[in-house]
Amino acid sequence: MKKIFFQFSFVILIIFLLICINTVSFAQTTVADSSKKSFRLFEDDKIIEITLSLDLTTYFKLKPKDEYLKANLTIHLSKKDSISRDIGLKTRGIWRNQNCTFAPIELNIKKAAFGYTDLDKISKLKMTPQCNFNKINEDYVLREFLAYKLFNVLTDTSFRVRLLRVNYIDTQKKRKPIIQYAFFIEPLEMLSARTNCLPIKLRTLNQKNIIPRIMDRLSLFNFMIGNYDWSVPGQHNVSVIKSLSYEPTGLGIVIPHDFDWTGLVNATYAIPTEEIGTENVRERKFFGVCRSKEVYKQELDMFLGKKAEFYRVINDFLT
């Protein structure tokens, strides 16, 4: 009887060990497979639902730019599935930082370990929320998002964006949850790696340091959307990168960002300065380099060739 009991117990032990081994192996495989997946943060267009938990009073009133606030970011993958990680949050920008209730945000997700290849390569992620609470500010942030998508039509060397619906939760429980639109902006390092380029930080650059056709394309695009709020010198609302695979001339590629002062957005606060010489941002003025009509005609023909795609992007956005 003891022998039978011993054999039976031994068999149970072996089965238990096999189950444990298989369970451990399966868990390790799952983690490994997850780490190889891309979240497709800037490849897909579907709106992302996120929850951002932080001390809203400190964010609204102090708008810290030097030190990160403790925050928690939850990405809702579906109605039942989500990823939640502790992160750091601080504000950025100049005009909107000083004048908006919701200042532009930088999320520090370097140590978040989401388990997705693209997310885990990002250290700092820019987020553009709507400026204030009312409906018109919701329209502004959506139109600014659209401006990025329109420039994507012209070139791959452009900042990709991802639309968000954000649920702001006050960790101090002094405010009710706030739900608004916002969008993520592709980090410059990610854009540079994607296009095989190198970021150029020199503030002394001017338009003559940019590849001519790239400079003309940007000037015409800004004319099209009524954008005066940019400058290559000082890299005001533009970033400059240099290709590592072509253009041996050493000239750079200029990429625009921050479109809230454009005629396309038409924000009430976007008032041209006296130096611009226009009454409003919907009155166009061209700020390109002086070139021949033939040169600009080539670039204008390219814009006309993209007309159908421009309309497709706009119509898809409106539906």
Residue map of PLM features:
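Bacterial Sec-dependent N-terminal signal peptides
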Residues: M1-T29
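Phosphate/dinucleotide-binding and metal-coordinating scaffold of catalytic cores
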Residues: Q28-T319
